[in-house]
Curated annotation (Swiss-Prot):
Domain S1 motif positions: 623-691
Organism: Vibrio atlanticus (strain LGP32) (Vibrio splendidus (strain Mel32))
Pfam families associated with the record: KH_1, PNPase, RNase_PH, RNase_PH_C, S1
Family to which the UniProt record says this protein belongs: Belongs to the polyribonucleotide nucleotidyltransferase family.
Catalytic activity: RNA(n+1) + phosphate = RNA(n) + a ribonucleoside 5'-diphosphate
InterPro entries xrefs: ExoRNase_PH_dom1, ExoRNase_PH_dom2, ExoRNase_PH_dom2_sf, KH_dom, KH_dom_type_1, KH_dom_type_1_sf, NA-bd_OB-fold, PNPase
GO annotation terms (biological process): mRNA catabolic process; RNA processing
Enzyme nomenclature, EC number: 2.7.7.8
Compartments it resides in: Cytoplasm
Cross-referenced NCBIfam families: polynuc_phos, PRK11824.1
This protein's encoding gene: pnp
Name of the protein described by the UniProt record: Polyribonucleotide nucleotidyltransferase
Domain KH: 554-613
Length: 706
């Protein structure tokens, strides 16, 4: 029934990788089962042989899905099946998409869908690297016009050494978590989080990762040669050179003039008018011309106009030199009732950022295939349509918003205090209110400011900058603080976040081959200068965390009790702690070691909760006088509550100096009486005396029981 499957195994660092095709999903264009030390991913590729008529974009879709059966689990929730992609799945899908997208020919508009399914998981081997490798292999054997294959590597920095594909355990002690992907000759994508590493250390890690993944690229080439899928007979549509010349004659000079308009919306309006005029003029001459073809040529012309001006050394679109940062405006405390806020503006890019402090129960619980963990620092990025002057759908976050939020979080993570240093859950929200390039890096700057405004003791200010590149032949120009147009029309998007001490996050997307180590070094050094300039402006507004948190934020008070007293504070079925929270208006969290965290917006409420917990956990002291409350009467005496949950017996002979016939003649239930602790027997029973408490009034009384 099956043809003999093609299997390729190779050693990749400390891991054994196996690629297999020919058994499953034989109706797909290509399919690969890839395994790295018991972590297995099944990747299918379906590519349409024909493009949809008139389609002017490349419809590539990457879906990444983790199945809970891979970890031997059943999904939670009512329906007991996987639902929409998690944030982690979305980020991995973007990680796969970014290096493969530029390797399809620019004229290729056929629909391509990649579906990656994690089917087995080794908790020590993250599935993202093997998924990227499997995707590369599947595309390499698909026959579609793909200029790969690519490799992928994760690089750690542990004890001063670079480590290839570190395990999750090793990553906990690493100063770097960097993913690099590229072809045999070029780096295409970098995604990283670092703990204040230098530019040289980051570049070394990128080069190391690219060198190591050559093993993968070689193995995939051998795998593809063995599968021997015939290549498609696809050719880029012929360019109508006569029409191209007409378009250039009508629009080139006007577009060059339009790109000297520095204000974005005015420039867009003028460029739009030029394109409409050109289309109308050409169709008036020949009604058979295709408007989409003309607009495609105008887009290419527009790109060439902007790029040639930059390569020639002319001022940029908004009049700046190549290494200039746009004008900055930095404000903090802009919203009266939030715990922390900032408004960061860089040219026509602006972010309104808020910081909110919560308790440990506000932490996000992430239940992934790799296990459950708590996240005490959340950063959410919103990109509403009005920020670019458009209308559009407003709803749940899109892939891009999730990705940008994660990048900003990576930039800030290294300076965040530990939970022991600052026992709060912190949520940051960045609302992009204006956008013209590098809104994710504006979010980094705004987050740093908002956290300081909220009184979060971050280790240092963090700023982010987006760099760009235009390369023609051997000539290239590196641009600082790129605009949206420069990002779209350039060859590289290179985002760097960091402190004055070093880099905390680096993201790189390269659209062309030929980006050398030297070019990346120049870009990193130029980014360092821009970052330090932004940090100096930010430090003028706020250079350190405020001494106190907002009056509207919960204050967390920490106390410690003996672990064997935890059950007393919680009570039967949680009754005691529930009553404490409701009656004092506080939030109380108890850890297994007896640490209690009390969160309250008012100091008096926290003090009352602390007092009551101290009472509950207090030990009864022999010889001490307590103000007790009669709990119940018996023929032989009375049971008196001296501390919450702790009763003692006043024997009938210890009620008064004279003979007592009936206990009820002297006491009633609910009556408050002073009692002295005479002894505590081996069984923990407490013997009390009323008459000795009256006889020795000089001794200090304990707080009344409730």
């Amino acid at each position: 029934m099956f043809e003999k499957p093609v299997v390729k195994s190779f050693q990749y660092g400390n891991h054994t990788v196996t690629l297999e095709t020919g058994v499953m999903a034989r109706q797909a264009t290509a399919a690969v089962m890839a395994t790295m030390d018991d972590t297995s991913v099944f990747v299918s590729v379906v590519a349409k042989k024909e493009a949809v008529a008139g389609q002017d974009f490349f419809p590539l879709t990457v879906n990444y899905q983790e199945r809970t059966y891979a970890a031997g689990k059943i999904p939670g929730g009512f329906f007991k099946r996987e639902g929409r992609p998690s944030e982690g799945e979305t980020l991995t899908a973007r990680l796969i998409d970014r290096p493969i997208r530029p390797l399809f020919p620019s004229a290729f508009k056929n629909e391509v869908q990649v579906i990656a399914t994690v089917v087995s998981i080794n908790p020590d081997v993250n599935p993202d690297m093997i998924t990227m490798i499997a995707t590369s292999a599947a595309l390499a054997i698909s026959g579609a016009p793909f200029n790969g294959p690519i490799g992928a590597a994760r690089v750690g920095h542990i004890d001063g050494e670079l480590v290839l594909n570190p395990s999750n355990t090793e990553l906990e002690n690493s100063k770097l978590d960097l993913v690099v992907s590229g072809t045999e000759g070029a780096v295409l994508m970098v995604e990283s989080e670092a703990d204040n590493l230098s530019e040289e250390e980051m570049l070394s890690a990128v080069v190391y990762g690219h060198d190591q993944q050559q093993v993968v690229i070689k193995a995939i080439n051998e795998f593809a040669a063995e599968v021997a899928t015939p290549s498609w007979n696809w050719e880029a549509p012929a360019v109508n050179t006569e029409l191209k010349a007409q378009v250039a004659e009508l629009a080139e000079t006007r577009l060059s003039d339009a790109y000297q308009i520095t204000e974005k919306m005015a420039r867009y309006e003028q460029v739009g008018a030029i394109k409409n005029d050109t289309v109308e003029a050409l169709i008036a001459q020949d009604e058979n011309l295709d408007e989409r073809e003309i607009r495609g040529m105008l887009g290419s012309l527009e790109k060439n106009v902007v790029r040639s001006r930059i390569i020639a050394g002319n001022p940029r679109i908004d009049g700046r030199e190549k290494d200039m940062v746009r004008a900055l405006d930095v404000r903090t405390g802009v919203l009266p009732r939030t715990h922390g806020s900032s408004l960061f503006t860089r040219g026509e890019t602006q972010a309104l950022v808020t910081a909110t402090l919560g308790t440990q129960r506000d932490a996000q619980i992430i239940d992934s295939l790799m296990g459950e963990k708590k996240d005490n620092f959340l950063l959410h990025y919103n990109f509403p349509p009005y920020c670019v002057g458009e209308t559009g759908f407003v709803g749940s976050p899109k892939r891009r918003e999730i990705g940008h939020g994660k990048l900003a979080k990576r930039g800030i993570q290294a300076v965040m205090p530990s939970v022991d240093e600052f026992p709060y859950t912190v949520r940051v929200v960045s609302e992009i209110t204006e956008s013209n390039g590098s809104s994710s890096m504006a979010s980094v700057c705004g987050t740093s400011l908002a956290l300081m405004d909220a009184g979060v003791p971050i280790k240092a200010s963090v700023a982010g900058i987006a760099m760009g590149l235009v390369k023609e032949g051997d000539d290239f120009v590196v641009l600082s603080d790129i605009l949206g147009d420069e990002d779209h029309l350039g060859d590289m998007d290179f985002k760097v976040a960091g402190t004055n001490a070093g880099i905390t996050a680096l993201q790189m997307d390269i659209k062309i081959e030929g980006i050398t180590k030297e070019i990346m070094q120049i870009a990193l050094n130029q980014a360092q200068g821009a970052r330090k300039h932004i940090l100096s402006v930010m430090d003028e507004a706020i250079s350190g965390a405020r001494e106190d948190i907002s009056e509207f934020a919960p204050r967390i008070h920490t106390m410690k009790i003996s672990s064997d007293k935890i059950k007393d504070v919680i009570g039967k079925g949680g009754a005691v702690i529930r009553a404490l929270c409701e009656e004092t208006g506080t939030t109380i969290e108890i850890e297994d070691d007896g640490t209690i965290k009390i969160a309250a917006t008012e100091g008096a409420a926290a003090k009352e909760a602390i007092r009551r917990i101290e009472e509950i956990t207090a030990e009864v002291e022999v010889g001490r006088i307590y103000q007790g409350k009669v709990a119940r009467l018996a023929d032989f005496g009375a049971f008196v509550t001296i501390l919450p949950g702790k009763d003692g017996l006043v024997h009938i002979s210890q009620i008064a100096d004279k003979r007592v016939e009936k206990v009820s003649d002297y006491l009633t239930e609910g009556q408050e009486v002073p009692v002295k602790v005479l002894e505590i027997d081996r069984q923990g029973r407490v013997r009390l005396s009323m008459k000795e408490a009256v006889e020795t009034p000089a001794e200090g009384e304990a707080p009344a029981a409730e």
